[in-house]
Amino acid sequence: MSKRLLLFDFDETYFKHNTNEEDLSHLREMEKLLEKLTNNNEVITVVLTGSTFQSVMDKMDQVNMTFKPLHIFSDLSSKMFTWNNGEYVESETYKKKVLSEPFLFEDIEDILHHISAQYNVEFIPQRAFEGNETHYNFYFHSTGNHNNDRRILEVLVRYANDQNYTARFSRSNPLAGDPENAYDIDFTPSNAGKLYATQFLMKKYNIPVKSILGFGDSGNDEAYLSYLEHAYLMSNSRDEALKQKFRLTKYPYYQGITLHVKEFVEGKYDY
C-alpha cells in the first residue's frame, strides 16, 4: 500500500483555540487515529501554518497534544521542521531552497511605504521581527469598503511582484487571535507558502496528488486546497466565500478531521 499524505492548517483546523473539556475527548480520538496510522506506516502527517514554530509548540502544550506530526511547516511554510529522535529539527535543505533569492526587510518596508503613501493607509507589524526572517506579516485594517480593500491589496501584490517579492493577503481570523475587520498581509520568499510546501513533499516522497488529503479554514489555505483533489474546508470556518468554493467537513474541528481521515484511508474517496 502506498503512503498517503495528510496536510493540516493549524489554527482553527488542527488546533481549536477555545478547546474545552468536551472537545478534549474528540482531540484524543483524533490523535489516537493519527498515531495508529503513522505507526502502521500508512500516512505522513504534516502541519502547514502561518504561525511561528514556537507558537505551534506553545499551543500544542496548552491542550496537552501528544501526537507529533512528522513535519511542521511554520511561518507560512517558509520553515520546515521534522520530528527526529524525540525533537523537531529544522531542515537545512528546505532552508536553502527558501533562501535561494534575496529576501530583505528593508525592501519590504519600501514596498509598504510606497502603498501607504499612495492610498493613505497603514500596515501594522503582527509581531517583533528578528534578523533574517523568512516571513514578515502585517495587519491591514479595512477601509470600510470591501471592494476598496481588495483594490488596494491587489495593487500591493502587483507592486511587490514588480520588485521580485511575493505578497499574499487574506481575511484575518479573530478566532485565532486576530483583530476584527482586518486582513493578514504576508511576505515570504517565492519558494515558500503552503502550496510550495505541498509540492515539495510530493516530490520528496513521490506521492501523487490523488493520495493527499488537505484541511484548512481561511484564505491562506485557498491556494493549496485548490490544488488538491481531496480538500476540505473546516465547517467552523468564518470565511463565507471559501464555504461556497470547497467541500465542508461534516463536523467542526477535531471531529471533522477524524471522520474524513478515516474515510480517506479506507479508500472512500478513491476513484
From Swiss-Prot:
InterPro entries: HAD-like_sf (IPR036412), HAD-SF_hydro_IIB (IPR006379), HAD_sf (IPR023214), SPP-like_dom (IPR006380). Keywords: Hydrolase. One of its GO terms (cellular component) is cytosol. Its EC number is 3.-.-.-. GO terms for molecular function: magnesium ion binding; phosphatase activity. Pfam families: S6PP. NCBIfam families: HAD-SF-IIB. Belongs to the HAD-like hydrolase superfamily. This is Uncharacterized hydrolase SAR2294. It comes from Staphylococcus aureus (strain MRSA252).
